[in-house]
Amino acid sequence: MYLPISKSETRGLVTTLIVILNIIIYVLTSFENYFLNISNYWLEKLAYSPLLLYSGEWYRVFTSMFTHADIFHIFFNMYFLYFFGREVEKKIGSLKYLILYISSGLLAIVFHTAFISITSSIGLVTPAIGASGAISGVLGAYLLLYHRRVLTFCIFIPLPICFPSRAGVFLIFWFALQVIYGYLRFVSSIAYFAHAGGFIAGISLLYLFSPRTHDYRRFTIYNGVLYIVKTVRKGFGKFSKAILSILVLSLLIGSVYSITNSSKLNAMYVFNIATTSDGADISSDTAVYINDNDVILPTRDDPRVVFNRFLWSGLLKNEAKARYVDSDFKINLMIKDPVYGTNLNLYVAGFIEYDEQGVLKNFKGTITTDVLVMTRQGFIEKISIKPGVKYYATIESRVHGENIGLTILQPFSVISTIVSLTAMYIVLVKDRDLVEPEYVYEPVEYYNGYFI
C-alpha cells in the first residue's frame, strides 16, 4: 500500500464535506455489522449493477459512489481523496471541483459497464460500490496540474518504508496497474476499468475547468533593473507522455472493440432450481447463466449438482432445440467433469421445454447421475464417486435484460470512446496548458524611458 505524505496546508471545503458525507453513509450502512462492513440490505439497495439500469434504477449510479464495502475500503479512499482533492479544489475552485468529482464518478461507471464485454459478462449482475472512480478523476486532474511535485510515499511491507518521488511517477505507475490488471482480468473484486476510466475522465474534464492564461507581471528588483515575471508551463517529459499515450490508446482500442462486441450480449437467464433426493427436504437455489463461460452457480449442493449436469451435458442451451417441447423426454449420457476430468453417468427423464434461443425454459422430472464426493484429510483432498444418485428436480428460467448490449453497453462504449479520444488529445497536445506553472524572471532592457 502506497500512502502519499505532504506538508501542504491547503484547505478544501468541498473535499472535506464529501469525506464527511461518505463517512456518515458508511456509519449508517455498516451499523448492524459493528462498522466493519456494509450490511447486505444496503448493498442490495445502493450498489450499482448494469442489469438494474435496464429496469430503470438509474439512481444507483449516484448512490454507489457514496457507498463502501468495509472499513479499509472507505479509509484508503477518503485518505487519497483528502490528500489529492484539496489541491485540485484550490486550483480550479470548489464548484468546478465538485462537478469534476461527480462527473468522473459517473464516467467511471460508464467505463466499468462498457468494458464488461471484455472482462466478464458476470459484471452485469455483480454489485459495484465505492468512490474510487470519482477519486480516480481527481488523481487524473492532479497528474496534469502537479506532475512535477515531489511527494513522500510510504510502502507498508509490513514495516513502513518511505521515499520521495514525483507525483507523476507514482500516478502514472498506478494508472498503468489499473489498465494492465483490467486487461489481464486479474482475479479481484476491484473494478479496474472504473479506476482507469475515472482517471482519464479527470484529465479530460480538467481541460474545461482549469485556467490556461499565461501570467506576465512587471516589477523592479535589485539596482533598479526592471524584470518581467513570466510563468512557464512544462508539460510531460517524452517518456511520461509516451507511457500515458500508450495507456490511453489501449483504453481507446478497448472502447472501440466494446462498441462492436457489446451487441453480442443479448440477455441473461436466471434459473430457479428446486431439488430433493432420498426423501430429504426440498433444496432451492438460483443460478445465473449468460454463456458457457459466464455462469454463477448455485451455492447449495443438490441444486448445484443438478444445474452442473444440465450445463456440462449441453442440455442447458442447445440452439438446435429452439422452441422444443417434450413431455416424455429421456436421454442417457456419459459426461465429463471439466474440473477433475472424471467421466460421470447421467440419465434425465421428464418434461422439458426450450425457448426460441434454445435455452432451457422448464424442466420437471428426475436426474440420475454419479456424484463426486470430496473429503479432506489434513492437507490431502480425496475424491470419490457416489454412483447413481437420483434427484427429483424442477427448473424454471426467466430472461432479464433482453438486448442490454444494444441499449446500455453499446451507448456507454461510445461515450468511453469519446472520453478516451479527448484524453489522448490533451495528453499529446494540451498538457503544457494545464500544468501548474513555474516562475521565471527575465530582465527588461529600456532606452529613454521606453520599454522595448
Each PLM stretch: what is its role?
Residues 419-451:
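Juxtamembrane interface at the cytosolic side of transmembrane helices
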Residues 3, 35-36, 312, 340, ...:
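Short, aromatic- and cysteine-enriched interfacial helices/patches
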Residues 272-429:
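Extracytosolic and intramembrane catalytic regions of membrane-associated proteins
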Residues 1-279, 291-293, 298, 396-431:
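A detector for small-residue-rich transmembrane helices and their helix-helix packing motifs
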